[in-house]
Every structure is written in C-alpha cells, then in structure tokens.
Amino acid sequence: MSKPFKLNSAFKPSGDQPEAIRRLEEGLEDGLAHQTLLGVTGSGKTFTIANVIADLQRPTMVLAPNKTLAAQLYGEMKEFFPENAVEYFVSYYDYYQPEAYVPSSDTFIEKDASVNEHIEQMRLSATKAMLERRDVVVVASVSAIYGLGDPDLYLKMMLHLTVGMIIDQRAILRRLAELQYARNDQAFQRGTFRVRGEVIDIFPAESDDIALRVELFDEEVERLSLFDPLTGQIVSTIPRFTIYPKTHYVTPRERIVQAMEEIKEELAARRKVLLENNKLLEEQRLTQRTQFDLEMMNELGYCSGIENYSRFLSGRGPGEPPPTLFDYLPADGLLVVDESHVTIPQIGGMYRGDRARKETLVEYGFRLPSALDNRPLKFEEFEALAPQTIYVSATPGNYELEKSGGDVVDQVVRPTGLLDPIIEVRPVATQVDDLLSEIRQRAAINERVLVTTLTKRMAEDLTEYLEEHGERVRYLHSDIDTVERMEIIRDLRLGEFDVLVGINLLREGLDMPEVSLVAILDADKEGFLRSERSLIQTIGRAARNVNGKAILYGDKITPSMAKAIGETERRREKQQKYNEEHGITPQGLNKKVVDILALGQNIAKTKAKGRGKSRPIVEPDNVPMDMSPKALLQKIHELEGLMMQHAQNLEFEEAAQIRDQLHQLRELFIAAS
C-alpha cells in the first residue's frame, strides 16, 4: 500500500533552502540525533522540511504547539504530498472537563467531555497509516504525548478478512462486537455494521467515505467489495481487508479478566491503608466506585473512565511510561518540532499539572493509586522515545541550541526578497510624542502600526492618549478571547483602525503584511517581555512589509537588545547580499485578509471528497432571557449541531464560542424547568 513520497510543488528550492535541505539531510544520514533549523518568517520552512521528507523517504511526525497551527501545517503538507498519507492527530475533545476534587469546598467535578467524531476518525486513520505504510506524515499537537492504546494489543484485536477464507457469520459478528462496533440495521454510520441475509456491511471506524461489504456463501467469504455508504455504489472489489478496532483502547477479553484480578488486589491493599489511617469515608467511596467499574468491565468489556486502569490493561508496571503515538512511529522515523521554542516547554509542563490533579483524587478515595500512571509522558521519557529530531523555529530556545551543539542550520534568505526591518533606538523621555508622529506618517499612507508596552495600565493609558489625539486605535489584552482577537487582527488589516496596542504581541502565526512599524516601548527593561527571543519575535511582525521598521525606545542598549539588533542586522545583510547577486527587488505580500480566519478550511476541503460544497455556517443569534423551556431545548439542539459542524471543519475558535453559549443556555434551561 506504501508509495514513495512524491513532492508536489510548482516551485524549486531557492534562497537558503537548497543549503538548508542539504545540511539537514547530511546530518540525518550521519546519525545526528538533534538538529535545529533557524528559519525566519516567510522563508519557507515547511517547504524545506517537505523536501527533506521526500528525499529521505522516511515516515515523519510533525509536532505543533496548538490545534490551529497543526491545522495549517496539515493543509500545507497535504498540498505537498497529495498522493501520500498525510494525517492529523490532535485531541478529539471539542470540550473536556477532567474529573477533579476540590477539598476546600468538598466538591467533586465529574468528567465531562464532548468528543469530535470527525477528529476521532482522523486519529484512527493516523495510527492505521503508521502501522500499514511508510509514506506517512502525521501532523500532531502535544496530544501525541498522552496515553493511547497499546499498539501490540491493538494489532492483536484486528480482524483480517480474505476472499475464500472459512469463517462463520456469527464469528464475524462476535469479533466486530469485540472491536466495539455496534450493529445498526437502520442508520449506517462510522463504527457500525448491518446484516442482510448473508451480506454484512461494515463502516470502518477510521474511514469517512468508504465502507466494506462482506458477502458469504455458507461459511466461506465469497466476495469483498468497497462501496460508498451514501450512495451504495460499489467502488471496487478487493482480495483482502483488515478491520481495525473502533477505538484505540480495545483490549482482548483474557487481558481484561487478568486486569480485573490485579485491580481487585490493588483495591484490597488500598482499603487496608485507608482504614489504618482512619479514612472511613474515603475507603467506602473507593470501594463503591471501583466495584461498579469492575462490574461494568465484566459485563461490557469497558467502563466509564477505563483509562484510569490503563496500567493493568496494557500490562505495565508501576511508574512505566504509557503507550503513546510515539510507539506507533517506526524506529527509523523522523520527528519535526515546529515552533520548538513554544512546543518544547509545553511538553515539559504537561506531566506536572496532570499529576497534581490526580494525587488529590487518589488521596480522597476517588481513584486507585494506579490512576497516576494514566498520564502524559514525562519530559525525560519523551526524550528517550523521540527519534532523530529537527527543531524548527525563528528563535530557537536554549534547549534546542544545546541539544544540537550550537550548530544551527540557517534559513534566513526569503525567496520573495523581503528584508528584515530597519531598527532604530530612540530615547524613552519623548517616546509617546515621537510615536504619535510616526503613527500619523504611517496612517497617511495606509499602513499599520503595532505598539507593545510592559504593563496593562500603560497600554490602557497609551490607547486613551492616542484616541484623544484623533488616532484610530484598539487595545489587545488578555481578557479578549481567541475569536475576538482574530477579529481585531482582521479589522486592523482591513484598515478599520491604524494602531494596535498590546503587551505581548509576539504570538506565533500573527501574520500581518500591512504592518510597517513595530514600536517597542521601554525596550531597555530586561525581563521576559524584553528578552532577546521576545524582541526578535516582536520585531519580526514588521518583516512582511517592504517598508518594515522597528523602533526600540530605551535610554541604554541592554544585552538582549544588542543581541536582537545584531541578529536582525545579520539577517538583513544576508538577504540584501542575496538580492543584489540575483537581481531581486523585494516584493510585498498580498495575503488575503480572509486567510487568517479560515485556517481550518483546507482540511474541510480535503475531507469533502467531492460530495458537494459545504454550506456556509451561520453564527448563532443572541438568545432572549424569557424563552420557554421547550424553545430553549430546541435552541440547545440547534447550537449543538452548529458546534459540531464548526468542529468538523476544524474551526475550533468558532466551536468554542458556541460551546460557551451552550453552557449559558443549559443553565437557563435548568432554571426555567
């Protein structure tokens, strides 16, 4: 089923790309475990990585810091490799509230989650591709370090069907039930099967547009065919087919029985400890909850919160790392960590937060101590599991630089010829008046300005001052949610206002070609917001404009300022030299404003598979407070459908906005009832 990676692009590597590709490939072939690609904004880092994958023909996992950037990368990789398996693996929860206990108020919060069926299917498709093929690129979020079903058990549970094999119909149905497929003769959907005489139709859990028809003659498989579940039209007949489990967490019956005995042993030991410490309530609570889970596992093969018993189900010892997506990646696989200066610290922080919450649950008798082993990987475990790694960032962190021995692959030259901004340092005493005159110059020629301050109070005062002097200005602060933030950025690009003031405007993916000036107030105050890395990221916001300029207001040049200015000058000189040698005139970017709000659109298109155009999704209206319970319930169902539609298109911000509205509506419904 595997094909060689075939790169599809109208462009050939140019600028620094050929040298970067050569050095990365040489490093990988020489066995280097860690390499860092320092690629500035707009230099084509994704294209470079795609070339490395295509040249070396190795299965690859790309880690992104969040779902939105993962969606962007998935869309780009899908365009580069249309004939290969490009997969998407992020958390399948549209909404997730983990179970927790607050001792101070004696409040237990039940686990509550809304699973996105479409993303669950994409996750299953990703692991299937990793097990079956070598031409696979999986774009994943930090969800990749969380526990997943054991690949060995997952492989054991698969159902292999071959034309001519002898198998009883009941045996097939029994195996499908073990794989957690449900029989549904009416509504045929993903993860179900239907039976009509000697014909069994199965809708694979990892597929969104193809189902399998198994035709039996007595106890022999006579024919296997793939068909469109919507139209019923046969697509092709095949000699064999493998049906994967409906979920990553299925376990063979004998393993469940063994796990139940081990759970009973741990329960007995834990009860003894609690009683010795005179914790009678906790002992009773733990016994009741665990016995209920054991009964469910005995009858159904699973229970709510079965992941808390994952240590027993996968046969691991106490403290051993859980199986994750890394266990599905072949030994010669390649790991690419995008925006590594953000992603690496994220990976390091996941374990501690999860541990703190679960320790409280164990202490107060809500869970057995083994629940602590249902966790994300520790950072040292991630390091041990990670294959050869390429870190990609415009501002690599100390960790990446240390791991790659300070030997960084530079990709500074942009094929468009755009130069890094000119940097000026000006005194603090006159910074506000000087900034006002600069803003007026930019506004007169229809260009935009970003201003970063150190404190919320200063940002508010500056915004007020600029408004009083007739400037069109907005203020971006931490209370603004993701969707509104994107709308403010869109309005800035459209020219609804000219100046955006904020405290931390260096978020990755902030892509605004219209911004020609970045002003950094109090640049000489050393700290997190004025570190070398933060300054380079902020200065880079003006790097997509031909007239890009950055003004740093400070009475002295700090070490961080000196390094940031030096690095920007180095990049600028290198680009200028390249432009002169190749006769390139810098070209401004004319990126459509709609792009920034439609990051999930590519994925929705790739998944549509020619089934007609997607309907425009209408935003929900404001809900009157005096609606009847019946009308409220109708509105709740309507918004749930809308939320799922947004989530299916990977428009997570819109889905989250509707989810928050649903919470309010449900509270109103309870009060009205």
Curated annotation (Swiss-Prot):
Domain spans labelled Helicase ATP-binding: 26-414
Record-linked CDD domains: DEXHc_UvrB (cd17916), SF2_C_UvrB (cd18790)
Gene field: uvrB
Binding site for ATP: G39, V40, T41, G42, S43, G44, K45, T46
Domain notes: The beta-hairpin motif is involved in DNA binding.
HAMAP family from the UniProt entry: UvrB
Motif Beta-hairpin boundaries: 92-115
Start and end residues of each Helicase C-terminal domain: 431-597
InterPro entries: Helicase/UvrB_N (IPR006935), Helicase_ATP-bd (IPR014001), Helicase_C-like (IPR001650), P-loop_NTPase (IPR027417), UVR_dom (IPR001943), UVR_dom_sf (IPR036876), UvrB (IPR004807), UvrB_inter (IPR041471)
Record's protein name: UvrABC system protein B
Family membership: Belongs to the UvrB family.
Domain UVR: 633-668
GO biological process: nucleotide-excision repair; SOS response
GO cellular component: cytoplasm; excinuclease repair complex
One function term, GO molecular function aspect: ATP binding
Subcellular location field: Cytoplasm
Pfam families attached to this UniProt entry: Helicase_C, ResIII, UVR, UvrB, UvrB_inter
SUPFAM superfamilies cross-referenced by the UniProt entry: C-terminal UvrC-binding domain of UvrB, P-loop containing nucleoside triphosphate hydrolases
Keyword annotations of the record: ATP-binding, Cytoplasm, DNA damage, DNA excision, DNA repair, Excision nuclease, Nucleotide-binding, SOS response
Oligomer status and interactors: Forms a heterotetramer with UvrA during the search for lesions. Interacts with UvrC in an incision complex.
Its job: The UvrABC repair system catalyzes the recognition and processing of DNA lesions. A damage recognition complex composed of 2 UvrA and 2 UvrB subunits scans DNA for abnormalities. Upon binding of the UvrA(2)B(2) complex to a putative damaged site, the DNA wraps around one UvrB monomer. DNA wrap is dependent on ATP binding by UvrB and probably causes local melting of the DNA helix, facilitating insertion of UvrB beta-hairpin between the DNA strands. Then UvrB probes one DNA strand for the presence of a lesion.
